[in-house]
UniProtKB/Swiss-Prot annotation:
UniProt similarity note: Belongs to the complex I 30 kDa subunit family.
Upper lineage: Eukaryota, Viridiplantae, Streptophyta, Embryophyta, Tracheophyta
Protein name in the entry: NAD(P)H-quinone oxidoreductase subunit J, chloroplastic
The reaction(s) this protein catalyses: a plastoquinone + NADH + (n+1) H(+)(in) = a plastoquinol + NAD(+) + n H(+)(out); a plastoquinone + NADPH + (n+1) H(+)(in) = a plastoquinol + NADP(+) + n H(+)(out)
One Gene Ontology term of the molecular function aspect: quinone binding
């Protein structure tokens, strides 16, 4: 079943895939990485002016990685804001997704965390570097195929 945003995008010839609705009734769409930046700009102009959150997860060991964006359309005088969830999947061998930092500035630290934990490179992000782990850390700790090191010394903890 397609939601109103999916129908709106389809009428304009914008490639996407409807993933249905979540348990709260929020429409979920899948966008290809190569189409994500242009569709993000269109969604912003359409009124999705607030990026509530961005996160990422490992779909399966050896499988795809996903970057998830929760967008909200905030309008004056509207009590129930319209929301949409966008999922962008990428291959773990070369995980690259266009950054939407220049569309929604609030994605700055969130994309950096996704990079730090899962190794997804967000193209054109101005400060893409580790945010939680030390720069010397090897690997991506939230990937399902990650092998934790036996010992890691935290230096200068106190």
């Amino acid at each position: 079943m397609q939601g109103t945003l999916s129908v709106w995008l389809a009428k304009r010839g914008l490639v996407h895939r409807s993933l249905g609705f979540d348990y709260q009734g929020i429409e979920t769409l899948q966008i290809k990485p190569e189409d994500w930046h242009s569709i993000a700009v269109i969604l912003y102009v359409y009124g999705y002016n607030y990026l509530r959150s961005q996160c990422a997860y490992d779909v399966a060991p050896g499988g795809l990685l996903a970057s998830v964006y929760h967008l909200t359309r905030i309008e004056y005088g509207v009590h129930q804001a319209e929301e949409v969830c966008i999922k962008v999947f990428t291959h773990r061998s070369n995980p690259r997704i266009p950054s939407v930092f220049w569309v929604w500035k609030s994605t700055d630290f969130q994309e950096r965390e996704s990079y730090d934990m899962l190794g997804i490179t967000y193209d054109s992000h101005p400060r893409l570097k580790r945010i939680l782990m030390p720069e010397s850390w090897i690997g991506w700790p939230l990937r399902k195929d990650y092998i934790a090191p036996n010992f890691y010394e935290i230096q200068d903890a106190y």
